Design a protein with these regions (language model features):
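Histidine-anchored nucleotide/phosphate-binding helix
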Residues: 15-29
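Short, solvent-exposed amphipathic alpha-helical segments in soluble enzyme
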Residues: 21-25, 54, 80-81
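Conserved PLP-enzyme active-site core in the AAT-like
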Residues: 34, 48-52
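C-terminal structural segments of small proteins and small subunits
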Residues: 78-106
């Protein structure tokens, strides 16, 4: 079973785009058995203001935005209003690694 965790951390749209596109295509075309997405750090702000990328990330069901970072940046409420799932991500990351997910960071 092949499982991938895409960890979006960059605030640069051009760096995020390959990870988001790959994740969406991997999910649609069943390239791997499971795809999860963690949105962390500066990428949260970038996605909040980039409707296209935000929508693509939301296509990957279960995408999780970091609550700690979002609260620190004052964006948690805005993200939730747009439909993002905002929660603490430390434990989900550790669990995914323990479950054998390959982590791809963008």
């Amino acid at each position: 079973m092949t499982k991938v965790l895409i960890w979006l951390a960059s605030g640069d749209r051009e760096k995020l785009m390959p990870g988001v596109i790959w994740g969406v295509n991997a999910k649609r075309n069943k390239w791997v058995d499971e795809v999860r997405v963690i949105v962390f750090g500066e990428s949260e702000k970038t996605l909040l203001h980039d409707t296209e990328l935000f929508g693509m990330v939301q296509e990957i069901q279960g995408a999780l935005f970091c609550r700690f970072v979002a609260e620190k940046n004052g964006t948690a409420e805005q993200l939730e209003k747009r439909g993002a799932k905002v929660d603490y991500v430390g434990q989900p990351i550790a669990k995914a690694i323990a479950e054998g997910f390959t982590v791809l960071t963008f």
